[in-house]
Amino acid sequence: MNLEELKKRQEKIRNFSIIAHIDHGKSTLADRILEKTETVSSREMQAQLLDSMDLERERGITIKLNAIELNYTAKDGETYIFHLIDTPGHVDFTYEVSRSLAACEGAILVVDAAQGIEAQTLANVYLALDNDLEIMPVINKIDLPAADPERVRTEIEDVIGLDASEAVLASAKAGIGIEEILEQIVEKVPAPTGDVTAPLKALIFDSVYDAYRGVILQVRVMDGVVKPGDKIQLMSNGKTFDVTEVGIFTPKAVGRDFLATGDVGYIAASIKTVQDTRVGDTVTLATNPAAEPLHGYKQMNPMVFAGLYPIESNKYNDLREALEKLQLNDASLQFEPETSQALGFGFRCGFLGLLHMDVIQERLEREFNIDLIMTAPSVIYKVNLTDGESMDVSNPSEFPDPTKIATIEEPYVKAQIMVPQEFVGAVMELAQRKRGDFVTMDYIDDNRVNVIYQIPLAEIVFDFFDKLKSSTRGYASFDYELSEYRPSKLVKMDILLNGDKVDALSFIVHKDFAYERGKLIVDKLKKIIPRQQFEVPIQAAIGHKIVARTDIKALRKNVLAKCYGGDVSRKRKLLEKQKAGKKRMKSIGSVEVPQEAFLSVLSMDEE
């Protein structure tokens, strides 16, 4: 293609993504658009086509990004090239969303006609506004009996400040309004601006590992052209690779001769590991590099850590291989080997957030058939020592001696909770119980309230989400972002069995709650650990101070059974003998801790 044709083609390109809260109908809308533009034959069509992972379909969420090229012949008779970039809607994957939005010029905002705006919709709209996207509101599910499009329209205008007078009323399920949406994309989404003649700049917004071709980059070309045979360079680490293939997805990968400015597609360059290709990085040509990378790239750091241990210790190597395979597709997953006296060999893993942790755990169990134990999730604490040093600690067992600690800081998040008015009291009570500080509260409409709190991340990691859902009958929606580190009165609590620390049960807790948490755990363990031949004390300790204790009584044989009547000194002798035996047993005996004990402590409910 010559320059003229490339420029003409560029004017016909429309790059857009779909933003929505979970369950507002994003994947269904994407399916309808694919059908309408006849990208996918009806034979290949299946619900949630873009969500290719089983887990995504089951949970009804989008985890990995997908980008698809469609051709659409508009009413003006011209054929346009659409690139639909699917985004995950969940808070853990916010960075992925922001990168995929950076690859677009426009976004379709899908809002449920019955439920209205939710917390995550809002978070993603702000990301889209940060990237200067043209936002087109679509009010979906208008065929529901509870639908109230007019209320939702005013909500969009009041809460987000978008003009919703031209919002399309649609039902993706019934196929209503799809054509209007496609026409709006043609009219409203600007064509990509970018210079075909400039040095290559392409934004990586996802990468997928392929066993035969190595890592395949999903890119949006901002400037320039890339074709097979070019030598590309990654700007964050300067590594170079030879391009073996470029192409587009029409869900299936289709090879092309080149990718030019405005195109969204893939580059294969026999790259060995996903670690080299960070989402948000810029690809350029090694022979004619761009002067500076695209802005907005940042290293993703895990926020939540937990130990993963195989239940059968001989599965340790399988677990390592499984984690390495998952890491090929998920550069934000980090892990390193760790050992625990109680659980044996395993890995300390870092995750972006709770959903990410859940998904990884479930994929390990489902795709690789490994049964796991997970230790209590923890966050990164900044520990300032008395000698002026400071250290980051994410594992309770690595905490320094309490006498050496000057202060401990913990991460706080800004939590935004949207909830119907009648549940505001319950939400506030929950947030206070989780050590939250109230920031502000405003009414979205007559019935819904947006409450903002600063809450320690450690409290959210625990079971905040489940508690929030149950105290609001599932009506609350919730979004959080890391805000700052603050000094807190935190202590490390150890659990001792028969005087020995059980490392896997140690956790960090706020001083004010230490006593009740300790009491809860020792009582819970007492119910679970089977009785031994000797008495076993269970203690919760902070440093050397015991804050809670309970004993598991010994099982004892009735040694007096064969003394009928008889002398009291004879009985005493037998009892003393038994007592001495128990004492000896206790000094050398060890207590087996059943698997449930760990799990029960992790699912700590304040019953």
Swiss-Prot record:
What GO biological process terms does the UniProt entry carry, in alphabetical order?
positive regulation of translation
GO terms, molecular function: GTP binding; GTPase activity; ribosome binding; translation elongation factor activity
tr-type G domain: residues covered: 11-193
Q: Which InterPro entries match?
A: EF-4 (IPR006297), EFG_III/V (IPR035647), EFG_V-like (IPR000640), EFTu-like_2 (IPR004161), G_TR_CS (IPR031157), LepA_C_sf (IPR038363), LepA_CTD (IPR013842), LepA_IV (IPR035654)
Annotated localization: Cell membrane
Q: Which domain of life is it from?
A: Bacteria
Query: Gene3D superfamilies recorded for this chain?
Result: 3.30.70.240, Elongation factor 4, C-terminal domain, Elongation Factor G (Translational Gtpase), domain 3, P-loop containing nucleotide triphosphate hydrolases, Translation factors
Q: How does it sit in the membrane?
A: Peripheral membrane protein
Q: Does the keyword Aminoacyl-tRNA synthetase apply?
A: no
Annotated source species: Streptococcus pneumoniae (strain Hungary19A-6)
Listed A to Z, the keywords are: Cell membrane, GTP-binding, Hydrolase, Membrane, Nucleotide-binding, Protein biosynthesis
**What is the official name of this protein in its record?**
Elongation factor 4
Q: What is its EC number?
A: 3.6.5.n1
- Keyword Coiled coil present in the record's keywords: the answer is no
- Reported function: Required for accurate and efficient protein synthesis under certain stress conditions. May act as a fidelity factor of the translation reaction, by catalyzing a one-codon backward translocation of tRNAs on improperly translocated ribosomes. Back-translocation proceeds from a post-translocation (POST) complex to a pre-translocation (PRE) complex, thus giving elongation factor G a second chance to translocate the tRNAs correctly. Binds to ribosomes in a GTP-dependent manner.
Catalytic activity line of the entry: GTP + H2O = GDP + phosphate + H(+)
- Write down any Gene Ontology CC term: plasma membrane
PANTHER family xref list: TRANSLATION FACTOR GUF1 HOMOLOG, CHLOROPLASTIC, TRANSLATION FACTOR GUF1-RELATED
Indicate which residues the UniProt annotation says bind GTP: 23-28, 140-143
Give the UniProt family note.
Belongs to the TRAFAC class translation factor GTPase superfamily. Classic translation factor GTPase family. LepA subfamily.
